[in-house]
A protein has these predicted regions:
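Short, acidic, Ser/Thr-enriched surface-loop or helix-capping motifs
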Residues: 45, 88-89, 194-195
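Rossmann-like dinucleotide-binding cores of NAD(P)H-dependent redox enzymes
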Residues: 1-44, 48-49, 107-115, 123-157
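Short, surface-exposed charged micro-motifs
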Residues: 31, 77, 90, 190-192
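FAD-site-proximal beta/loop scaffold in flavoenzymes
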Residues: 52-127
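Conserved beta-strand segments of alpha/beta enzyme cores
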Residues: 22, 79, 164-167
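Conserved N-terminal phosphate-binding loop of PLP-dependent enzymes in the Aspartate aminotransferase
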Residues: 20, 86, 191-193
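Flexible, glycine-rich terminal cap/loop adjacent to redox cofactors
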Residues: 126-127, 143-154, 159-230
Length: 230
């Protein structure tokens, strides 16, 4: 979660640990060896300790890249970067009559983004309603346990853009749903605010249904809502 807000990352980590997930930080390398029963995954930490995480099965989540290797793009001079097709604001590639949208490009890899890119292309080329895709303030969800979601700038990004006077509002609480059964589940809400206009430039949440809740928050952020509006 390197590109996400630090408070969101910490809250996700704390929640996962609370749910029994072991997280080992500051590791130097991971080795995987075949055994009689499956595979052994060993993590070597910076302090010289080795920990065997699994001795039966291993799942490696190493990211993904566009599946463009066999499309013959090099034969028509379509430019790529690390397999991703390079496009301009109109989804046009380096070849004038070839366009590309979705996860095969170098833009944000989210399903709603790909759908809207396709609609923008269709409106421009065939609907006489030219428009470009707006990549600002796109809500994003992480389906961890606990669930997390975000829209707009992280606190760090906001400070780079607006200086250290950026206002940050946090609230960590136990939802009413968990009070009666006395479960220790926490929800984090965080707003990042432009100090000059009081406009909310970033919103971050960790907790139940964060992915759905952030959709409504994103509308407010896109419309320029201020802290007072919240």
């Amino acid at each position: 979660l390197r590109s996400f807000d630090n408070d969101l990352r910490s809250a996700v980590q704390d929640g996962m640990i609370h749910h029994g997930v072991e997280i080992i930080n500051n590791t130097e390398d991971v080795s995987i060896a075949k055994t009689d029963t499956g595979v052994a995954v060993t993590v070597n930490s910076k302090d010289g300790k080795s920990v065997i995480l699994a001795d039966v099965v291993s799942l490696a989540a190493l990211g993904r890249k566009p599946n463009t290797a066999n499309l013959g793009l090099e034969n028509v001079d379509v430019k790529t970067h690390n397999g991703a097709i390079l496009v301009n604001a109109d989804s046009q590639t380096s070849v004038e009559n070839i366009y590309s949208v979705g996860d095969c490009t170098d833009n944000i890899q989210l399903t709603p983004v790909a759908i809207n890119e396709g609609r923008a292309f269709a409106d421009t080329m065939f609907g006489n309603k030219p428009r470009t895709m707006n990549y600002a303030d796109i809500p994003t969800a992480i389906f961890t346990t606990p669930e997390a979601a975000t829209v707009g700038l992280t606190e760090e990004e906001a400070r780079e853009m607006h200086g250290d006077a950026v206002k940050v509002y946090r609230s960590s609480f136990r939802p009413m749903y968990y009070v009666l059964p006395n479960k220790q589940e926490k929800t984090l809400m965080k707003l990042v605010v432009d100090p000059t206009t009081n406009r909310v430039v970033g919103a971050h949440m960790v907790g139940d249904h964060a992915a759905e809740i952030i959709q409504g928050v994103a509308i407010a952020v896109k419309m320029g809502a201020t802290k007072a509006d919240f």
